[in-house]
Swiss-Prot record:
It comes from Homo sapiens (Human). GO terms for biological process: bud elongation involved in lung branching; ear development; embryonic camera-type eye development; embryonic forelimb morphogenesis; embryonic viscerocranium morphogenesis; gonad development; in utero embryonic development; metanephros development. Pathway: Cofactor metabolism; retinol metabolism. It catalyses: all-trans-retinol + NADP(+) = all-trans-retinal + NADPH + H(+). This is Retinol dehydrogenase 10. GO terms for cellular component: cytoplasm; endoplasmic reticulum membrane; lipid droplet; membrane.
Amino acid sequence: MNIVVEFFVVTFKVLWAFVLAAARWLVRPKEKSVAGQVCLITGAGSGLGRLFALEFARRRALLVLWDINTQSNEETAGMVRHIYRDLEAADAAALQAGNGEEEILPHCNLQVFTYTCDVGKRENVYLTAERVRKEVGEVSVLVNNAGVVSGHHLLECPDELIERTMMVNCHAHFWTTKAFLPTMLEINHGHIVTVASSLGLFSTAGVEDYCASKFGVVGFHESLSHELKAAEKDGIKTTLVCPYLVDTGMFRGCRIRKEIEPFLPPLKPDYCVKQAMKAILTDQPMICTPRLMYIVTFMKSILPFEAVVCMYRFLGADKCMYPFIAQRKQATNNNEAKNGI
């Protein structure tokens, strides 16, 4: 194609992409079904991972739950089984009422499988993934959610904690994706969800390791998405989830300026996950919660650095992590004193 003609074609496609994006904001697309599909969630034992598991269970997905904590993972599985029992009871009642067997059969055999896995260890990921393939089947939806935070200033953070943060928050996404993507490519079907953070789009002081890991995983996700497009594997969808501070206890004590906080409070975990689920089930490539984060990211990209610093100071975002770090340090000192260290 002549380069001039191609230029106009590309220009039209870019403008059309804006039109489609605007349409998505005004009229939300119909949500796809994940009923009967194998959905694997890392970090499913608590926080957002547990809530993702419950949401996928309500949509009748077959769940595979990974967590390093066996007990909390089993607790999540118990909640999922309770949802499954309610769904099966509703199906049985509908069948008895004569609403049509064809609506019931596709949703039978709802199951949840639990695996204790440290996603920060490559071999553990690959071995557990092989067990999943043998015992459950191939994964259709992969939700990379597991995450950790050290809670130390850079010069006070032990090297092993920095490495741990990078392994769990970033490297694990490489390993889980390498484990399950090949089959998705073969059948041109699947969905990879990356739960990152707004701190993967812009940073703040005191959490260098966490920000680096989240920036890294955002880059991984974007490159993977481009690779799938280049390979014309349009049946494999990707969704990047970048929430603002979520009130899960992970960053307990983190505070912005008190006058601003009523307008930008920590997100409720339920709200965060429900918004993410809407994005996943409509194949939305990326979601920032709240939407203000889109504006913050855009302004950070165009403003001079000193202007960004001024904004951070006004919002109290420049040192928002310091109370959280102080609490972590105090808790560590208390544990050491309690254990006689």
